[in-house]
């Protein structure tokens, strides 16, 4: 008779062979493909919420305050595009750190440019 190791090996190989056969059957069998689509459609799509800024949790509330407050938009192109929108209060709070960050990035670019030529 066959040893238990041989039997386990044959079982493992047959299971792997079945998995390979099932993977290839979706192309040939439209029913298997439909079953896979049904399984995927059961999961509801995830809703993405914007991050809360300064305690604003709902976008509906944000629209009212934005009408009264002016926004500042900063855009510049370097080797990459950067765009930032800030309200007046956010600019007052983070303006100095943002300025230092941009200055560091831009001065790095200027210092590296002559070395490349």
Curated annotation (Swiss-Prot):
Which domain of life does this protein belong to? Eukaryota
One GO MF annotation is: growth hormone-releasing hormone activity
Q: What is its main location?
A: secreted
Q: Where is the signal peptide?
A: 1-23
Q: Tell me which Gene Ontology terms the entry assigns under biological process.
A: actin polymerization or depolymerization; adult feeding behavior; decidualization; dendrite development; energy homeostasis; excitatory postsynaptic potential; negative regulation of apoptotic process; negative regulation of circadian sleep/wake cycle, REM sleep
Lipid anchor (O-octanoyl serine) at which residues?
26
Keywords recorded for this protein, A-Z: Amidation, Hormone, Lipoprotein, Secreted, Signal
**Lipid-binding residues (covalent, O-decanoyl serine):** 26
Composition-biased stretches, type Basic and acidic residues, lie in 31-43
Q: Where is this region: Disordered?
A: 28-69
The subcellular location is:
Secreted
Lipid sites, type O-hexanoyl serine: 26
* Tissue and organ distribution: Mainly expressed in the gastrointestinal tract with higher levels in the stomach, medium levels in the duodenum, jejunum, ileum and colon. Low expression in the testis and brain. Not detected in the salivary gland, pancreas, liver and lung.
Q: Which family does it belong to?
A: Belongs to the motilin family.
Q: What is this protein called?
A: Appetite-regulating hormone
Upper lineage is: Eukaryota, Metazoa, Chordata, Craniata, Vertebrata
């Amino acid at each position: 008779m066959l040893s238990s190791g041989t039997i386990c090996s044959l079982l493992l190989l047959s299971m792997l062979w079945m998995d390979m056969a099932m993977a290839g059957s979706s192309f040939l069998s439209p029913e298997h493909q439909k079953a896979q689509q049904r399984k995927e459609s059961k999961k509801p799509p995830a809703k993405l919420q914007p991050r809360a800024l300064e305690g604003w949790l709902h976008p509906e509330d944000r629209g009212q305050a934005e009408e009264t407050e002016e926004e500042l938009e900063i855009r510049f192109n370097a080797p990459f595009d950067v765009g930032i929108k800030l309200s007046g209060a956010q600019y007052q709070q983070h303006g100095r750190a943002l300025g230092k960050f941009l200055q560091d990035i831009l001065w790095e670019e200027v210092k590296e440019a002559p070395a490349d030529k």
